[in-house]
From Swiss-Prot:
SUPFAM superfamilies the record matches: Amidase signature (AS) enzymes
UniProt record, GO biological process: translation
Protein name: Glutamyl-tRNA(Gln) amidotransferase subunit A
Entry keyword set: ATP-binding, Ligase, Nucleotide-binding, Protein biosynthesis
Organism: Nitrosospira multiformis (strain ATCC 25196 / NCIMB 11849 / C 71)
Gene: gatA
Listed InterPro entries: Amidase, Amidase_CS, Amidase_dom, AS_sf, GatA
Reaction catalysed by this enzyme: L-glutamyl-tRNA(Gln) + L-glutamine + ATP + H2O = L-glutaminyl-tRNA(Gln) + L-glutamate + ADP + phosphate + H(+)
Amino acid sequence: MLNASLKQLSAMLAARKISSVELTSEFLKRSRALNPEYNAFITLDERTSLAQAQAADILIGSGRGQPLTGVPIAQKDIFCTKGWLTTCGSKMLSNFISPYDAHVIGRFNAVGAVNIGKTNMDEFAMGSSNETSFYGPVKNPWDTAAVPGGSSGGSACAVAARMAPAATGTDTGGSIRQPAALCGISGLKPTYGLVSRYGMIAFASSLDQGGPMAKSAEDLGLMLNVMAGFDARDSTSLEREPEDYTRDLEKPLDGLRIGLPKEYFVKEIAEDVARAVEAAIGQYRKLGAETVEVSLPNTKLSVPVYYVLAPAEASSNLSRFDGVRYGYRAPDYLDLNDMYRKTRAQGFGSEVKRRILIGTYVLSHGYYDAYYIQAQKLRRLMAQDFAEAFKECDIIMGPTSPTVAFDLGERSSDPVQMYLSDAYTIAVNLAGLPAMSIPVGFGHKNRPVGLHIIGNYFAEAQMLNVAHQYQLESDWHTRMPKE
């Protein structure tokens, strides 16, 4: 049951071979046993989860079950969840019980899925290793000396360790795809605007996007069928006809043109990552695809551009956390201004403070034109790079991360090295494109390697087809870490 797909679990539930209460109990038992070691969950609420499972069993018994009814799903602790502690990995929200559900939570509630728990994450989604969480670092289940990636490290760890069959994540610069790669699971960042951001605590609003994390591409499609959809409460939500993202999974890949950016295959990639990625691309050739070289000339600028734009938006978004209406408030202060200063100084961690300072600096008088405006111009050029590349190919591929998971603490004292962990994922967010990572092997110290698959706007069904066809010929996505 631990390795069963979402489709298989849904079929078992529909056929009454197992109840949602039994299924949820099994995953809760496993989560409670493993969480002290991995720290994947911030909150587990057994009573609420089992109550949802009981309600799901009633739905299924009355013939009103849908795909994912009764299936336990782990939710990243960035999504507001009514009646649940919603911390965003921060001391600032360590006492915040959300009074409402985020769009994503509401969509899963509507189909009768079970919320098995809220997963750990980098504070306010700012990090690439899940070491900035107020609740402590998450450990990689393949090697507990290694990071799981971030910021959705808790979700990636929970799925990889089979503490949950699937999870939600968010991706601002790679925060679904990078931890998916480092933990050996599949993760999808949809086209910007496809999944509503309502109730998703904001980091950088023009870059943030929610998405699914699961063992396989097929599971991602089933999750996206629930998560995607127009929401009038989010001004950036796209009004599109609903579609079945699993519809093309079995389509053969004959004639598929795979673009290989020359900027992605450079000496900075670790040899073990390069070998696994090249072997996967070779398998695609056997499946009937052809490869063409393309160029994304502004790729090298994606990290500096991102670290101007994302902190600028964060400095504005995080100004709302002041201790007045909700969240942490400093216990001792002289006056209102002193309360603001002490609350934010004590409530935010060092990485969040660093990005607020950077963002405030680049938006300040005298630097706005030199940094922020120039970064926006380069962002447009990166989108144009992808548009030109997609004239030559259908899908773009490369490594998700330049290395396998690095050791805990290895980069925490060097922010620039940490930021470079997302060198291959950031440009996708700047362009608003969809992209995903799937496991394609193992490298140094038996740590997983991920293949990055980038599609054109709204090409999620095609990307899932491309990933699924590879997974029919491989078993990397079915492998479990040793306990």
